[in-house]
Curated annotation (Swiss-Prot):
Catalytic activity: ATP + H2O + 4 H(+)(in) = ADP + phosphate + 5 H(+)(out)
Organism domain of life: Bacteria
Compartments where found: Cell inner membrane
Keyword Ion transport belongs to the record: yes
Described function: Produces ATP from ADP in the presence of a proton gradient across the membrane. The alpha chain is a regulatory subunit.
Principal cellular location given in the protein's record: membrane
Record's protein name: ATP synthase subunit alpha
Binding locations of ATP: G171, D172, R173, Q174, T175, G176, K177, T178
EC number: 7.1.2.2
Amino acid sequence: MVAKIQADEISSIIKERIDNFELSVDINETGKIVSYADGVAQVYGLSNVMAGEMVEFEEGTRGLVMNLEESTVGVVILGPGPLLKEGMSVKRLGRLLRVPVGDALLGRVVNALGEPIDGKGPIETTETRFVEEKAPGIMARKSVHEPLATGIKAIDALVPIGRGQRELIIGDRQTGKTTVALDAIINQKGNGVVCIYVAVGQKESTVAQIIRRLEDHGAMEYTIVVSSTAAEAAALQFLAPYTGVTMGEYFRDNARHGLIVYDDLSKHAVAYREMSLILRRPPGREAYPGDVFYIHSRLLERAAKVSDERGAGSLTALPIIETQAGDVSAYIPTNVISITDGQIFLETELFNSGVRPAINVGLSVSRVGGAAQIKATKQVAGTLRLDLAQYRELQAFAQFASDLDETSRKQLERGQRMVEVLKQPPFSPLSVEKQVLIIFAGNEGFFDDMAPSNVVRFEAELYPFIEASYPQIFENIRSTSKVDDNTNALMKKALEEFKASFIVA
């Protein structure tokens, strides 16, 4: 039996379908490559594109819109672009650049786009953030008041760093700038500070060596490495520091503490200059574009100590700048010096003469770190900077003067020994209480009758002796963060006892 088709049923179904019909049209603006050279494409037809928007070329390469011109837009290529050529289509992605953030990144090595490059599989994180974020405003900040110990005697005593500070590490090539920064990262073990190391324009072998060094000291478990090597496009080298700081801001905004190292911003400025000149932006001093100050200030202002209302988290920045023949008055060094809260100046002459870390105490300064320094360090290192400055002056004078009075000679000898006290091998950070003890020993004249060559050995043998015989000294300094009369007397007693048993070579 054939079923009868009811006309009214058919009409009601058709009406229902018409009522529920949705016309969804995917409108996608596309353009064409007019010219392509040196990692920059001029694209025609993207009239509604935003500055900083992501675009995609027909063979899959992504780009970032940097220039908005009258008829074309300048797009920098994010990755290798050998297959790009004139006439290829380009489509808008309608979004700004975002990178993954979160705890899943700890222990990983990523590129400037936040993609893993360490062969350990994908990063399991769902949260992403815009690479370009506004820095916290004045009311969202709090003054720097908590110490960030680097474990380096010369820094913690003379140029202390606080959480939320920006402290520049500046010096010629091969003066130990990266070593100082890595020491600071290694010393954060067990302190709850997340570290981010951003390598800009470095050799791949150098980055691999740094990662191995961090792994050897157990520091990779709380560190993220963002690497954009010299072989990569200038656009990726330019983006890497912003990617790193975006990852650091996640911890800062979640009431945690972060430390970020930019190694180095000289190469970052060179990458930006290369990109800007190809985009035909007008060059200024040293051929850098006019906004080269702004690219560094907007980056470094994102490191901050945030207010209690926002969770009291912090992000501390250690930017590195490489100088040429010690010239700190060049364009980029003066820019970054004026942005940061102080600088640690490393000198080739000191490095070559065996003073390592090669910190020039006279030129190094921490503008806000003094408020964060613990009382115990302040007590023992209060006059150390002045004493060392007077020693340097006297040392220069002693080269020409044949005979010195007794006071000057003693000051010169004390200065020599204090320089020895501040020497420290790389990748061996010291706890605050050990620093306080050894500087106290120098100030109290325990090395005055000892050859300077014995000071380092004296220090190495002193710590195990104190831990075994006088552990309460370290306990007192750790618990009270100051040197009271009782601790002072105990330190003198312990040092006298140890010195009596110390065999001078």
